[in-house]
Structures are given as structure tokens and as C-alpha cells.
């Protein structure tokens, strides 16, 4: 799944709007499984995972096996892929670092040969590339890392008329925009930058309180939280009272006394 680029919008999950569809689906699943619960509780499916991951995924695999068709295969593939994605976080950070370093290496050059790009990457002693493998980052490893962003080498022509395997800076624009801090040369000419927009916290945006993971979430939204549409109104406060009249909270405000000329 690619990261959202500036200017792209993704429809948010709305608990109040989407909950009824999920509730209806849950009821249908419960009715379908209810008659088979004794058999399902005794099931011991073949798991592609081990330890805690297997414990987490086993109920879903059991339901998939019960459904039949291609669901057993799809469920097991999803379990393996999602576990691999979680374990790939560190590798993902490495790929992002590669994008940043490639941007530095390109500068304003429209093309770079693979040899020159590798020379610049491996010449940075503070980067991980000189020690990436036994001899540092090579062409095959560079190609594999960049393929995750749909960036591939090709025969490129240089200003002096020569040709060699290399990369075009324009092919990095999309990945730089999605995964790296914004910079002027991250965008093709004529494409303006998209200003970032602050977003409200999920609880404020959806009009819901955050769930503590223990208590049952309240189905009713908190009226004091903003629902993301109407302008929030200022909380009501008791008005100030004049001197000599009853104050707030049932407390009388003592009348003022004139101390001038007192004996």
C-alpha cells in the first residue's frame, strides 16, 4: 500500500456512519457460525505462523477453513504477508533513507548512471551503504530496493552522447513526494507544491471519545466534542453578576461599603 501523497485524499473511516454496516455483517457471521461452534472450537488448523502470531490468527484461519473455497488460501496468505510487513518496518526505513540519499546524489541532474549513483552512495561514510553487504551497495541490491517504489534502471543517454545503464530523476518524483520531506526538486516543473493541512485528532474529528481498550466504548458521541462539520459553540458559562446581587453557585456577593469617612 502506497503512502498518501500531498493533494490526495483518502476517505476516512467514520465510526458513526460505518458501524451499522459492520454490525449487520457481524450479525450475519454470528448466525452462520452459531450452529457449527462446537466443531469450530475443537478445530486445530494448519498454521503458516508460529507462537503469538499463530495464536492471534488461528480464529480467523478457522473461520476461513469453515467458509471453504479460496478463503483458506487467502487467509493464510494474508497472515504471512501482514506479518512480513510488520517485520519489514526497519527495511522500510532503510528504503526511505535510500530515497533521500538518491535525491542528494541527483541534485539537478536529469539522469545518473548506475555506476555514478553507486559511487556517490557508497562514498558517504555516515550512510549505511558502504557496509551494505560484503562490498557495499551494488547494482543488483540497489535495483531490488528501488523496485519497491516502481523505480527501475534503463538505458539512458547522457549529454555527451554516451549511453549506459542508469536512472532518471523524473522516475523518483512520485516516491520522493510520498516518502521524503518536501523539497523544490521533488516535483516536475510546473507542478506547484501542495500546502500541508492540519488534521484534527481522530476522536475530535469523529465526535468520539478515545477507547481505553478495557471498558466498552460508548455508542453515543460526546456532545462536547466537535463532529468535524458544524462550528463548535463556546461552552456556556454563568454570566457575571453585579455587586450587591446574588453571585454564582448560590453564593451571595457581599455589598460594597464606602470606607471613606468611617469613624
Swiss-Prot record:
Which InterPro entries does this one have? DUF3631 (IPR022081)
Residue spans of biased composition, Polar residues class: 230-239, 253-263
Pfam families reported in the protein's UniProt record: DUF3631
Q: Where is this region: Disordered?
A: 183-263
Identify the keywords attached in UniProt to this record, alphabetized: Plasmid
According to its UniProt entry, the function of this protein is described as: Probably does not play a direct role in plasmid integration or excision.
* Miscellaneous comment: The given protein N-terminal is putative, as other possibilities exist in ORF1.
User: What's the protein called, per UniProt?
Assistant: Uncharacterized 28.9 kDa protein in xis 5'region
Which species does this protein come from? Answer: Saccharopolyspora erythraea
Amino acid at each position: 500500500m502506497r503512502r498518501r501523497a500531498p493533494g490526495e485524499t483518502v476517505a476516512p473511516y467514520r465510526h458513526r456512519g460505518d458501524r451499522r454496516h459492520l454490525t449487520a455483517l457481524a450479525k450475519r457471521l454470528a448466525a452462520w457460525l452459531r450452529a457449527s461452534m462446537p466443531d469450530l472450537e475443537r478445530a486445530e488448523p494448519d498454521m503458516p505462523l508460529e507462537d503469538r502470531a499463530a495464536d492471534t490468527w488461528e480464529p480467523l484461519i478457522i473461520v476461513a477453513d469453515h467458509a471453504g473455497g479460496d478463503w483458506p488460501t487467502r487467509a493464510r496468505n494474508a497472515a504471512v504477508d501482514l506479518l512480513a510487513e510488520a517485520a519489514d518496518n526497519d527495511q522500510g526505513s532503510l528504503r526511505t533513507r535510500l530515497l533521500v540519499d538518491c535525491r542528494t546524489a541527483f541534485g539537478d541532474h536529469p539522469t545518473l548512471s548506475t555506476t555514478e549513483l553507486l559511487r556517490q552512495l557508497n562514498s558517504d561514510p555516515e550512510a549505511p551503504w558502504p557496509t551494505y553487504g560484503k562490498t557495499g551497495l551494488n547494482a543488483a541490491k540497489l535495483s531490488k530496493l528501488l523496485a519497491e517504489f516502481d523505480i527501475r534502471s534503463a538505458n539512458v543517454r547522457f549529454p555527451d552522447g554516451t549511453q549506459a545503464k542508469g536512472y532518471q530523476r523524473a522516475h523518483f518524483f512520485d516516491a520522493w513526494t510520498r516518502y521524503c520531506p518536501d523539497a523544490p526538486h521533488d516535483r516536475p516543473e510546473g507542478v506547484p507544491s501542495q500546502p500541508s493541512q492540519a488534521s484534527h485528532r481522530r476522536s475530535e474529528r469523529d465526535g468520539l471519545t478515545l477507547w481505553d481498550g478495557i471498558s466498552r466504548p460508548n455508542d453515543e458521541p460526546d456532545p462536547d466534542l466537535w463532529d468535524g462539520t458544524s462550528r463548535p459553540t463556546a461552552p456556556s458559562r454563568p454570566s457575571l453578576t453585579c455587586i450587591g446581587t446574588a453571585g454564582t453557585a448560590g453564593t451571595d456577593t457581599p455589598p460594597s461599603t464606602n470606607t471613606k469617612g468611617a469613624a
